[in-house]
């Protein structure tokens, strides 16, 4: 079974047809690039996520002082990440690329939190 994306329905409204001779058509130079770069310039490849180490998720995680309730908040963070990931399952299955990317980032974040929880559990078991 192969995945086939659903094509958007053609937008044909009554009264609208192809542009006539008096309708201005934008040229390639007048349309801004979605990336904001110079047209024709190749953007360097940059991966969307990195699975080596904990993810940054757009913010810097603060270091917790020893003896704080870090494990409880890490576990709570993990539960909330899993809950958010659950909301992305159905849109991902329906073909949403943005939901798929959010789900990927959520999985990576959850894996990092699980590693933190396991490390905390091992530290507590040794003491």
From Swiss-Prot:
InterPro entries: DOC_1/2. Residues 9-44 have a biased composition (Low complexity). It is found in: Cytoplasm; Nucleus. Residues 65-107 are annotated as: Interaction with CDK2. Oocytes (at protein level). Phosphorylated by MAPK1 and CDK2. Pfam families: CDK2AP. Residues 1-47 are annotated as: Disordered. GO terms for biological process: negative regulation of G1/S transition of mitotic cell cycle; regulation of microtubule cytoskeleton organization; regulation of stem cell division. Its main location: cytoplasm. Keywords: Cytoplasm, Nucleus, Phosphoprotein. GO terms for cellular component: cytoplasm; microtubule; nucleus; NuRD complex. The keyword Repeat does not apply. Acts as a component of the histone deacetylase NuRD complex which participates in the remodeling of chromatin. Inhibits cell cycle G1/S phase transition by repressing CDK2 expression and activation; represses CDK2 activation by inhibiting its interaction with cyclin E and A. Plays a role in regulating the self-renewal of embryonic stem cells (ESCs) and in maintaining cell survival during terminal differentiation of ESCs. Regulates microtubule organization of metaphase II oocytes. Belongs to the CDK2AP family. Component of the nucleosome remodeling and deacetylase (NuRD) repressor complex, composed of core proteins MTA1, MTA2, MTA3, RBBP4, RBBP7, HDAC1, HDAC2, MBD2, MBD3, and peripherally associated proteins CDK2AP1, CDK2AP2, GATAD2A, GATAD2B, CHD3, CHD4 and CHD5. The exact stoichiometry of the NuRD complex is unknown, and some subunits such as MBD2 and MBD3, GATAD2A and GATAD2B, and CHD3, CHD4 and CHD5 define mutually exclusive NuRD complexes. Interacts with CDK2AP1. Interacts with CDK2. Interacts with MAPK1. This is Cyclin-dependent kinase 2-associated protein 2.
